[in-house]
């Protein structure tokens, strides 16, 4: 049974279909639930109204409105911290940066676990990955490898030539799409979101596994991996009973979702295992150059000179590198796509960016990494994009012990949901119109705010122990790609005076729904 045969992906429709025959049990469970929550000695955060037995507040999210937007509207009613129940999971929703700071400083250790999903468990190595391993010695060892060996500033500098090589290759392909200069004075159409996806995936795959050319015209192995990852992302968007009501997890088997995910997982694992073995064979034959040393090589170095955590070293290598590919490619693609969309809808901002580039770089050479510190407005554009359209609009954690947040008791096992999207649109922090795209705010009133997780009013990469370890790498890549795009090409919408559709998707990542079709032509005098 293929997943496409599932009649609906709307949680309420599915729940009604399967739960109506057991309505008597719902009444019994409701009585138990009401009795258990009556504890006058503890002050709990207010709970959103409308909750139901077993399904909790799921039915409120069945109207098609995106989860982060729905939760943002609920925060306007219940305040910056409130409780909600996603099925059987009690969840504390926080939309205020000061309360989030308390969670990720005072209570950071207690909120250091991430609840997984069916897709994460079956397709992305679950508790064996640095992204979802439970807090403890094993996770700390994995995290140390990621931050000190794979993504340290020294390592990023060491692999800069690999990144530059892939970026240059992708820009050459963009010039080729325009026509190698044969259409002098004319614009050519480009699917910009696809090109950005190829670029970021190529860069990350090169530095992680030494793989090149993941575009549609790439080699068969590259296309196979890209197809598997696209399928995994598609399956992740399906509603899974296991994620909200574990006792109904058997329905995911009945619907064929588990089988589809396991099939996809087998394909991904097979490819990752092949990559690891290819690296091992190359090393043993003495054909591995230090200049081409990628993340898999670094992990194998660690295996040779000490040891990797866990009982299966190859599993650690595969899961760590898969985490790097997932975290480094999609987030960057999503952010750059939103940045270009916003700039096309705000031509005055686009013009200001071009003026900065012409002043600092000129039109006789390409932008270099060394130029970025002199391009504060380009940097501000990335910040403002991630403020308005964070790639991951919600951050999820789970508390290991009872704790207190904003004066409210939070029982052990409660899930924490930080509404980054809502929090970063706070008019008390971002003066003027917080919903307006104004990069210059990061050069004036919010100039001291950065993306490294220490300023809680802007945390698109997360914060605390679980902050994304690849912040520096991702930001450097985004700055360079955006600067080069704006510097080297005139870019317009296909239809003059037509606004780019800014409709966004829900789920783990906030994708732009409609393709970003643009017209380009070169603008440099070289």
UniProtKB/Swiss-Prot annotation:
Membrane topology, from the record: Single-pass membrane protein
Induction / repression: Induced by elicitor.
Transmembrane spans: 14-34
GO biological process: isoquinoline alkaloid biosynthetic process
Gene3D superfamilies xrefs: Cytochrome P450
Family annotation (InterPro entries): Cyt_P450 (IPR001128), Cyt_P450_CS (IPR017972), Cyt_P450_E_grp-I (IPR002401), Cyt_P450_sf (IPR036396), Plant_Cytochrome_P450_Monoox (IPR050651)
Cofactor: heme
GO cellular component assignments: membrane
Regulation of its function: Repressed by cytochrome P450 inhibitors ketoconazole, metyrapone, prochloraz, ancymidol and cytochrome C.
GO MF annotations, alphabetized: heme binding; iron ion binding; methyltetrahydroprotoberberine 14-monooxygenase activity
Stored PROSITE patterns: CYTOCHROME_P450
Temperature effects on activity: Optimum temperature is 30 degrees Celsius.
First-listed, main subcellular location of the protein, grouped into a coarse class: membrane
EC number: 1.14.14.97
Tissues with expression: Mainly expressed in roots, and barely in stems, leaves and carpels.
Name of the top EC class for this enzyme: oxidoreductase
Binding site for heme: 468
Cell compartment(s), UniProt: Membrane
Reaction equations catalysed: (S)-cis-N-methylcanadine + reduced [NADPH--hemoprotein reductase] + O2 = allocryptopine + oxidized [NADPH--hemoprotein reductase] + H2O + 2 H(+); (S)-cis-N-methylstylopine + reduced [NADPH--hemoprotein reductase] + O2 = protopine + oxidized [NADPH--hemoprotein reductase] + H2O + 2 H(+); (S)-cis-N-methyltetrahydrothalifendine + reduced [NADPH--hemoprotein reductase] + O2 = 7-hydroxy-8-methoxy-11-methyl-17,19-dioxa-11-azatetracyclo[12.7.0.0(4,9).0(16,20)]henicosa-1(21),4(9),5,7,14,16(20)-hexaen-2-one + oxidized [NADPH--hemoprotein reductase] + H2O + 2 H(+); (S)-cis-N-methyltetrahydropalmatine + reduced [NADPH--hemoprotein reductase] + O2 = muramine + oxidized [NADPH--hemoprotein reductase] + H2O + 2 H(+)
pH dependence comment: Optimum pH is 8.5.
Pathway(s) this gene product operates in, as recorded in its UniProt entry: Alkaloid biosynthesis
Pfam family, one: p450
Function description: Involved in the biosynthesis of the isoquinoline alkaloid sanguinarine. Catalyzes the conversion of N-methylated protoberberine alkaloids N-methylstylopine and N-methylcanadine into protopine and allocryptopine, respectively. Can also use (S)-cis-N-methyltetrahydrothalifendine and (S)-cis-N-methyltetrahydropalmatine as substrates.
Protein name: Methyltetrahydroprotoberberine 14-monooxygenase
Taxonomic source organism: Papaver somniferum (Opium poppy)
């Amino acid at each position: 049974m293929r997943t496409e045969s599932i009649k609906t992906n709307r949680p309420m429709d599915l729940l009604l279909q399967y739960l109506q025959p057991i309505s008597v049990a719902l009444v019994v469970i409701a009585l138990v639930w009401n009795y258990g929550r009556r504890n006058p000695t503890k002050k709990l955060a207010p709970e959103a109204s409308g909750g139901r037995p077993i399904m909790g507040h799921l039915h409120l999210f069945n109207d098609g409105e995106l989860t982060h937007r729905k939760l943002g509207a609920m925060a306007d009613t219940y305040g910056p911290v409130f409780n909600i129940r996603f099925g059987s999971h009690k969840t504390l929703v926080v939309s205020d940066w000061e309360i989030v700071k308390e969670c990720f400083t005072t209570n950071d250790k207690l909120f250091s676990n991430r609840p997984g999903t069916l897709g994460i468990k079956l397709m992305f190595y679950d508790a064996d990955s640095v992204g979802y391993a439970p807090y403890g010695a094993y996770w700390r060892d994995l995290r140390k490898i990621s931050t000190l060996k794979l993504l340290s500033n020294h390592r990023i500098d060491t692999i800069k030539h690999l990144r530059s090589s892939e970026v240059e290759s992708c820009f050459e392909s963009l010039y080729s799409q325009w026509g190698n200069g044969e259409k002098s004075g004319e614009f050519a159409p480009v699917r910009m979101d696809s090109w950005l996806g190829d670029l970021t995936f190529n860069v990350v795959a090169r530095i992680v596994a030494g793989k090149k050319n993941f575009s549609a015209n790439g080699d068969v192995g590259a296309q196979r991996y890209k197809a598997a990852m696209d399928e995994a992302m598609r399956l992740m968007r399906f509603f899974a009973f296991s994620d909200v009501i574990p006792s109904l997890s058997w329905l995911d088997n009945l619907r064929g979702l588990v089988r589809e995910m396991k099939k996809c997982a087998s394909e991904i694992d097979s490819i990752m295992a092949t990559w690891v073995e290819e690296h091992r064979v190359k090393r043993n034959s003495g054909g591995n150059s230090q200049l081409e040393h990628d993340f898999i090589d670094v992990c194998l170095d660690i295996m040779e000179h000490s040891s990797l955590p866990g009982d299966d070293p190859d599993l650690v290598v595969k899961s760590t590198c898969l985490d790097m590919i997932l975290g480094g490619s999609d987030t960057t693609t999503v952010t750059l796509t939103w940045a270009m969309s916003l700039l096309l809808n705000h031509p005055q901002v686009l013009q200001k960016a071009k003026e900065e580039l012409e002043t600092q770089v000129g039109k006789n050479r390409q932008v270099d990494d060394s130029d970025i510190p002199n391009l504060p407005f380009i940097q501000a554009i990335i910040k403002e994009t991630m403020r308005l359209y964070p790639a991951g609009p919600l951050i999820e954690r789970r508390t290991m012990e009872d704790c207190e947040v904003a004066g409210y008791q939070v029982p052990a096992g409660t899930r924490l949901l930080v509404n980054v999207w809502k929090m970063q649109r706070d008019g008390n922090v971002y003066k003027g119109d917080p919903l307006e795209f104004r990069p210059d705010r990061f050069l004036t009133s919010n100039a001291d705010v950065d993306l490294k997780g220490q300023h809680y009013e802007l945390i698109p990469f997360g914060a605390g122990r679980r902050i994304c370890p690849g912040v520096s790498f991702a930001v450097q890549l985004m700055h360079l790609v955006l600067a080069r795009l704006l510097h080297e090409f005139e870019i317009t919408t296909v239809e003059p005076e037509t606004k780019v559709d800014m409709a966004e998707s829900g789920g783990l990542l906030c994708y732009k729904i409609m393709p970003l079709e643009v017209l380009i032509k070169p603008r440099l005098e070289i």
